[in-house]
């Protein structure tokens, strides 16, 4: 696994997006790792994976979400559901190195909440990095599983699902069919948004900006409101 990240990566960002993206990336991702002494900000291209798990061809390479997106989206759902928020499990589909789980845990501690947090990641090496980053936080369950092999009971409890463009349309359709409870979808970099909209979802809130990392939508199923 390639763990190198440095000045050349920032130069590439600058060349494509100007100064704005390197600044965002440093404060949203790189500095976060430095302050928390963890490893989440380095992306992992498909060609750099050490192994090819089930449905590897359907997956998208690893990249960390921005801090502000993770915090903003969960706080919006919290505000919408108010006292009912405590009933939801928080589930990151394609949890990678565990950044979303890490920030969720801090958010729950801040608000004195005890929601169950679950991360589902099909790549073993990324799951192992997440485990080290999370340092055995006792309110987080990590599952090294492909979405198709994830037990049905995970999808039978009310949940808030976080997806950072983890896979293509085929797996999204399978995922939608598997959910059997009241839920919200937080979709960061929503490449296949229309697949959700075509399956009876509605947009609760959204945001679009200069880079896909800042694009997100919050969705819910119309007939489960």
Give the predicted meaning of each segment.
Residues 1-82:
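S-adenosyl-L-methionine
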Residues 99-112:
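Conserved SAM-binding loop of SAM-dependent methyltransferases across substrates and taxa
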Residues 94-98:
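Class I SAM-dependent methyltransferase "Motif I" SAM/SAH-binding loop
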Residues 137-147:
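Conserved SAM-binding strand-loop segment of SAM-dependent methyltransferases
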Residues 130:
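Conserved SAM-binding loop
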